Amino acid sequence: MTKNIENSSEKGRNALYIASFCLALLVFAAAAFLAAKGKPTGWEYSWFRSINGWSEGWYHFFTVVTFFGSTLGALLSVIVVFATRAYRLAWRLALTIIGAYGIALVAKHVIGRARPVELLTGVHARAVETGMGFPSGHATVSTVIAFTLWPYLPKKLRYAIVPLFIGLVCLSRLYLGVHFPLDVVGGIAVGIGAVSFIRILPQAFRKRIRIS
């Protein structure tokens, strides 16, 4: 009886991860199609101008926030998890970050969308970034970190912590003038897709590579 319940629960989780992966793929495809056109228009242009135009009083706050989506921030998150002796979780987090970031880098070259300072005038460029803009690597990394750690966060707080964490990192990229809204949407989609894909892998395979 207990085994049947466990199997049913596992199937339910797999169905959720498959649905999440498919949705992430669709969102990414739609965002990539629009981003490939280059300059932002409509709502994307308005949102970028509005957030990028916030006062300089936000600078130090968002400079700290954006760190958590950086390469160093990713490394720090893995080290912290490893320090808690959750070795398999740390390994899974590291592999997912590497895989997702690799996908984001490939997508940047394929889509070829330039940064805001190259496409618009009057951008408040508060940070310097090189390379293409879509999708956002910071949005990708922060999403992977948040959703990989989701099951280990307090149940009453995870629904607030995860969206807040990802949302603030994404806002920081717009405020600093290094990404457009569709860039961070694409990054979130890559992150969710990567986390979901890892969980969809057969249990035996996950155990073999020591991520489960």
Question: In which residue ranges do the predicted regions lie?
Answer:
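N-terminal transmembrane-helix/juxtamembrane module of multi-pass inner/ER membrane proteins
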Residues: 1-73, 108-127
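Membrane-embedded catalytic cores of phosphoryl/pyrophosphoryl-handling enzymes
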Residues: 3, 7, 120-212
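Interfacial segments of alpha-helical transmembrane regions
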Residues: 14-24, 77-103
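Aromatic-anchored segments of alpha-helical transmembrane domains
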Residues: 27-32, 98-106, 165-178
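Short helix-capping/hinge motifs at transmembrane helix termini and TM-loop junctions
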Residues: 35-39, 84-85, 111-115, 154, ...
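Membrane-helix interface segments
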Residues: 57-58, 86-90, 154-160
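Hydrophobic, aromatic-rich transmembrane alpha-helices
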Residues: 74-85, 142, 146-150
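Hydrophobic alpha-helical transmembrane segments of integral membrane proteins
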Residues: 94-120, 179-193
